[in-house]
């Protein structure tokens, strides 16, 4: 009995201990993820590049140090730093293992149908090219392949050697302290030279059709080939490989030909010689064929089918979910025609329903033209004939400032579609329809994407700008440009297309030289951060705050005293466009492409009462409402659709439209019609052909819905020639289904991909300098030349949190906010004190020597005697002086003094005022006074060689230093020694290309005096003056084109000399290079003077045409003076090219005036 009890007690105790052990082992401790996933959760995804081992590193980089220059001597021992006991490989290696491997593959593949088709295809291509040659084409009419035999063996590689030096890829890591350690990166290019011999007996039989209707038979056998072959694998500028003979190989052909059963040696010699020429022309260095397969088959153009089936799991699309995208690195970017430039780049991501290329490049707009009782609306039209035989279309050639057309925001280059519902086919029809219309007429027009013209907007809002702005961030002489930037940021209309910024830049130069870029960075726009909610500063931050359940900042209450400016176009009333938040943050470039991004419309919002004189982005600007949660956004979709459909019907008066729009801005709406989501990364430094993002600032989280189909990725850099402009470096569109399938391939739902960037539109010129030699090779495709970007994708599981991204965004944003908010109040208070005491013009009588216009009424000063402000060079008639002081009393010189004082108060290393980047000051100073001079390339690369320099930021910020004031003898509007504001040349005129930047130049010590430039320009005004205007323009533009080419070539030569001078260590060679550089600089300086010389002729034509226009406007000005007094300070003067009463039925010339 006791034994049974003991057994029972033991069983019970054992069961209890087992359960207790199970509890402690299985339930007490939380399940741990695998080691690699735990590391990723703590540190984020880490991208590791493949690296060579120590022995391979020694083979690639170590042996070349002791190798003789001729390459014949064997390499020395290994370096002490890496495997000293292992001897370096010999210079030449035997490849018996490779020969055996190739022979085995040849035996298995020789008789397959796939190999036979590939060989016959290649032979037929050679036949086609042979028939196109002059010699063979005269005798041969056709070649057909009768038989082909690949031979008994393959080429035998006797020896092979690595061509040194081997250049390693950039890693972004600093070099070793002494530079002795071998690089740990893979090589950028591998080149091998092999001695090859072939005796395999490859032969083919050909049937030849001669020109006489006869046929012949040709048998060609490749008996022997001996030569040195170079095999190259390279990543520059894109990944490819090629092989080619180093020198002419020794080739023996065995040829037999028959014609009617008789030998024909003439045909035999032609074929043999042609085959040898083909090998020399195509397969002997420096000629070769760029190849991708079989090693790099991914280097092919990707395409998207129009009708694609979508994958669904039950009722859910495969792509729906939360996708985390992490940027890792970008490489091989083509920046301004070079692969070696350093630049700050950033990336934008967008979820969309369409691909980048599928977006339309123009938009249809509707505007209400208020003609009133005026005879002219200020338009000059041109009929463009269609190339397909149909009727042509009418485009706007010029728009007169302050005219009804300018107020309605019609711009040069707009294509008129219909007026009052009647389709437009001729310029005469436009004249009649507008003449017969009443006070108001509806105009339907098409505007190319990227076109911008802020002139009319500037004039329309000039009064309000003078009353509400105290531009403390402007430099001397830069008041109009800075105001243009601010107003353009408010008044521009970004179409629904996925815009290409490179296209924006070129389109603006094509239509108007001074048009600001559509994608001005908020860094370059004056902004008061202290009065904006976080949602208005960054949509990304706002989204993260909403996700994290943070309270949204309250909306700023508005003041009743401010009135919104009048609105013109009906499409602005779209609430989806009204409530679109400003893209990007106040510290980073915007998020182009910007889908459905419309103008943030003015409202009655204003800054605090305590800051009456503070510089704001625009006092009337609406504060964009913060983004709401997903459910609220979906509820707003139906409202957006209804308002979008009703938008074309809303043609109201200015006050009514403004009132409606202001009321609509309070409605929370979706930021785009197709539920697009955009994100932008932080800027990174791209150098040594590589740019890396930090893990803490390169991740974003997208909520993918069923309407999203593509992830559009674009890389951008700043445009050095346009303030606030951005240039697209490349883009790529990914199917979200491919991304989802790639993530689902592994259980951790993530994968890594390196994506080749597509060319921006319009493409950068890749054949000019960096790729001039490569573009001449067969197989070259410039679409491969724009670099690549490496991205990590991860689909988050349901319920899986990713606090890493939110934390990163907050870390990225908040320090800037704290810094700016803490800095601004002191400076704003100081600005207000200075602005109250110094804001009046100080006019004095001035006699002008050149054609001058009144800055107030915009009329010409015919007597050349007027009043000019002593501080800001503002010019006005003596009769306009009292009106000017009463209405526009703000003097621009006050802004310059304030800005100069604030610069001195600013701490060293601190961000410049109002979010402007440090180099904006230097860029802003470029537009102080427009001067003719350097072309784009000279400005960018060789200003030091010309003994000219841009006004630097340090010079601007020196105490007591002021910019060069305009001479009292000249007005800012005159064309003397300045770039003309009116362009009469074609859109691609060299005069525009060479003078679009308006750089302010200052003479260096020892450089040319300013009088030299003035003298050269004055002499150039008389060039070809005796010729007709059109012929004169053609001759001048021809010379400018020629000079541009010469400058480009000289710049390329100069850059090569600079690189050689940096690389060489020989003192004698360095002195020779210095002398060559000096001569190159002198040549560049001479070419620059010639460019100024011929550009002056273009300006002379512009001046003459403007004078003739003013003389005509003077004749009719007396009829319009009474009308001008009734326009509420929005139209100062109407410049008419031709009154309607003088237009006859035969006005079908090149241009018509309306």
Swiss-Prot record:
Low complexity compositional bias, start-end: 70-85
Localization (cell): Endoplasmic reticulum membrane
ZnF endpoints (Phorbol-ester/DAG-type): 840-891
Predominant place of localization: endoplasmic reticulum
A family per Pfam: C1_1
Encoding gene (name): PDZD8
Topological category with respect to the lipid bilayer: Single-pass membrane protein
SUPFAM superfamilies tied to this protein: Cysteine-rich domain, PDZ domain-like
GO terms, molecular function: lipid binding; zinc ion binding
GO cellular component, one term: membrane
Disease: Intellectual developmental disorder with autism and dysmorphic facies: An autosomal recessive neurodevelopmental disorder characterized by moderate to severe intellectual disability with autistic features, myopathy, and facial dysmorphism.
Stated role: Molecular tethering protein that connects endoplasmic reticulum and mitochondria membranes. PDZD8-dependent endoplasmic reticulum-mitochondria membrane tethering is essential for endoplasmic reticulum-mitochondria Ca(2+) transfer. In neurons, involved in the regulation of dendritic Ca(2+) dynamics by regulating mitochondrial Ca(2+) uptake in neurons. Plays an indirect role in the regulation of cell morphology and cytoskeletal organization. May inhibit herpes simplex virus 1 infection at an early stage.
Protein name: PDZ domain-containing protein 8
Coiled-coil region: 1028-1063
Keyword Zinc-finger attached: yes
Domain SMP-LTD: 91-294
PANTHER family given in the database record: PDZ DOMAIN-CONTAINING PROTEIN 8
Any one GO biological process: lipid transport
Keywords linked to the UniProt accession: Autism spectrum disorder, Coiled coil, Disease variant, Endoplasmic reticulum, Host-virus interaction, Intellectual disability, Lipid transport, Lipid-binding, Membrane, Metal-binding, Phosphoprotein, Transmembrane, Transmembrane helix, Transport, Zinc, Zinc-finger
SMART domains: C1, PDZ
């Amino acid at each position: 009995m006791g034994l049974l009890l003991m057994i029972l007690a033991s069983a019970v105790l054992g069961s209890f201990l087992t359960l207790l052990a199970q509890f402690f082992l299985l339930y007490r401790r939380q399940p741990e993820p695998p080691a690699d996933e735990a590391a990723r959760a703590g540190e984020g995804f880490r991208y590791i590049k493949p690296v060579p081992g120590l022995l391979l590193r020694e083979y690639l980089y170590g042996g070349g140090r002791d190798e003789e220059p001729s390459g014949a001597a064997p390499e020395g021992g290994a370096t002490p730093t890496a495997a000293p006991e292992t001897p370096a490989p010999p210079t030449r290696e035997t490849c018996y293992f490779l020969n055996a491997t190739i022979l085995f593959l040849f035996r298995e593949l020789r008789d397959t149908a796939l190999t036979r088709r590939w060989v016959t295809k290649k032979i037929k291509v050679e036949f086609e090219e042979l028939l196109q040659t002059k010699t063979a084409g005269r005798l041969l009419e056709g070649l057909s392949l009768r038989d082909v035999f690949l031979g008994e063996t393959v080429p035998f590689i006797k020896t092979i050697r690595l061509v040194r030096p081997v250049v390693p890829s950039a890693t972004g890591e600093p070099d070793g302290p002494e530079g002795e350690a071998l690089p740990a990166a893979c090589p950028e290019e591998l080149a091998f030279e092999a001695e090859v011999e072939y005796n395999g007996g490859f032969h083919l039989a050909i049937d030849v059709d001669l020109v006489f209707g006869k046929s012949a038979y040709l048998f060609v056998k490749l008996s022997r080939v001996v030569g040195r072959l170079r095999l190259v694998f390279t990543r520059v500028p894109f990944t490819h490989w090629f092989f080619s003979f180093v020198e002419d190989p020794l080739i023996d052909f065995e040829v037999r030909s028959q014609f009617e059963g008789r030998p024909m040696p003439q045909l035999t010699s032609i074929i043999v010689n042609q085959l040898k020429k083909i090998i020399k022309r195509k397969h002997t260095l420096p000629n070769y064929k760029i190849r991708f397969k079989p090693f790099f088959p991914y280097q092919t153009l990707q395409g998207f089918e129009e009708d694609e089936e979508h994958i669904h799991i039950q009722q859910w699309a495969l792509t729906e979910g939360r996708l985390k995208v992490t940027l890792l690195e970008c490489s091989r970017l083509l920046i301004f025609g070079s692969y070696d430039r350093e630049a700050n780049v950033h990336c934008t991501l967008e979820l969309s329903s369409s691909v980048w290329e599928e977006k339309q490049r123009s938009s249809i707009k509707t505007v209400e033209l208020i003609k009133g009782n005026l005879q002219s609306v200020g338009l000059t039209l041109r009929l463009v004939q269609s190339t397909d035989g149909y009727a042509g279309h009418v485009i706007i050639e010029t728009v007169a400032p302050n005219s009804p057309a300018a107020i309605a925001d019609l711009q040069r280059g707009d294509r008129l579609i219909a007026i009052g519902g009647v389709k437009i086919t001729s310029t005469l029809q436009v004249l009649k329809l507008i003449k017969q219309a009443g006070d108001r007429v509806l105009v339907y027009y098409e505007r190319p994407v990227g076109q911008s013209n802020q002139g009319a907007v500037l004039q329309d809002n000039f009064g309000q700008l003078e009353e509400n702005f105290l531009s403390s961030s402007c430099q001397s002489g830069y008041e109009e440009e800075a105001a243009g930037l601010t107003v353009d940021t408010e008044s521009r209309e970004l179409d629904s297309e996925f815009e290409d910024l490179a296209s924006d830049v070129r389109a603006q130069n094509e239509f108007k030289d001074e048009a600001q870029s559509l994608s001005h960075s908020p860094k370059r726009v004056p902004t008061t951060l202290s009065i904006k909610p976080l949602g208005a500063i960054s949509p990304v931050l706002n989204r993260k705050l909403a996700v994290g359940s943070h309270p949204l900042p309250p909306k700023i209450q508005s003041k009743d005293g401010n009135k919104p400016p009048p609105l013109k176009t009906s499409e602005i009333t779209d609430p989806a466009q009204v409530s679109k938040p400003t893209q990007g943050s106040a510290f980073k470039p915007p998020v182009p492409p910007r889908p459905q991004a419309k103008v943030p419309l003015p409202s009655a919002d204003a800054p605090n009462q305590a800051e009456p004189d503070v510089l704001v982005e625009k006092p009337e600007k609406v504060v964009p409402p913060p983004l709401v949660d997903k459910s609220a956004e979906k509820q707003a979709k139906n409202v957006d659709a209804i308002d979008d459909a009703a938008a074309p019907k809303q043609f109201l008066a200015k006050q009514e439209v403004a009132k409606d729009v202001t009321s609509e801005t309070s409605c929370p709406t979706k930021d785009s019609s197709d539920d697009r989501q955009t994100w932008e990364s932080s800027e990174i430094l791209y150098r040594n052909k590589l740019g890396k993002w930090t893990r803490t600032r390169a991740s974003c989280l997208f909520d993918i819905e069923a309407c999203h189909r593509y992830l559009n990725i674009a890389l951008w850099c700043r445009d050095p020639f346009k303030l606030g402009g951005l240039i697209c470096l490349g883009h790529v569109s990914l199917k979200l289904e491919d991304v989802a399938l790639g993530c689902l391939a592994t259980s951790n739902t993530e994968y890594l991909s390196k994506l080749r960037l597509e060319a921006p539109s319009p493409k950068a010129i890749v054949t000019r300098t960096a790729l001039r030699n490569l573009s001449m090779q067969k197989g070259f495709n410039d679409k491969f030349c724009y670099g690549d970007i490496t991205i990590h994708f991860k689909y988050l599981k349901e319920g899986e949190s990713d606090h890493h991204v939110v934390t990163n965004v907050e870390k990225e944003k908040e320090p800037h906010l704290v810094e700016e908010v803490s800095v601004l109040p002191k400076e704003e208070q100081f600005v207000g004190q200075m602005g109250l005491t110094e804001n009046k013009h100080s006019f004095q009588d001035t006699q002008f020597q050149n054609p001058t216009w009144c800055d107030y009424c915009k009329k010409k000063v015919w007597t050349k005697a007027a009043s000019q402000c002593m501080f800001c060079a503002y010019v006005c008639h003596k009769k306009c002086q009292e009106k000017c002081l009463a209405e526009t009393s703000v003097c621009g010189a006050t802004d310059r003094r304030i800005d100069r004082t604030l610069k001195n108060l600013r701490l060293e290393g601190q961000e410049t005022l109002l979010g402007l980047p440090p180099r904006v000051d230097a860029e802003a100073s470029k537009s102080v006074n427009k001067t003719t001079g350097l072309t784009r390339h000279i400005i960018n690369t060789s200003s030091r060689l010309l003994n000219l320099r841009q006004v630097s930021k340090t010079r601007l910020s020196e105490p007591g230093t002021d910019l060069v004031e305009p001479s009292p003898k000249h007005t800012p509007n005159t064309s003397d020694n300045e770039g003309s504001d009116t362009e009469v040349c074609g859109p691609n005129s060299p005069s525009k290309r060479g003078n679009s930047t308006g750089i302010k130049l200052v003479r260096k010590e020892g450089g040319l005096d300013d009088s030299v430039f003035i003298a050269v320009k004055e002499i150039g005004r008389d060039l070809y003056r005796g010729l007709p205007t059109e012929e004169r323009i053609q001759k001048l533009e021809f010379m400018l084109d020629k000079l541009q080419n010469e400058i480009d070539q000289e710049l390329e030569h100069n850059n090569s000399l600079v690189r050689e001078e940096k690389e060489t260590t020989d003192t004698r060679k360095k002195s020779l290079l210095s002398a060559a550089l000096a001569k190159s600089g002198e040549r560049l300086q001479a070419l620059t003077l010639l460019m100024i010389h011929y550009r002056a002729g273009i300006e002379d034509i512009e001046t003459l045409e403007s004078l003739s226009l003013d003389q005509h406007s003077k004749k009719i000005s007396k009829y319009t003076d009474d009308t001008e007094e009734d326009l509420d300070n929005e139209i100062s003067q109407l410049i008419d090219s031709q009154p309607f009463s003088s237009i006859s039925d035969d006005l079908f010339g090149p241009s018509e005036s309306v």
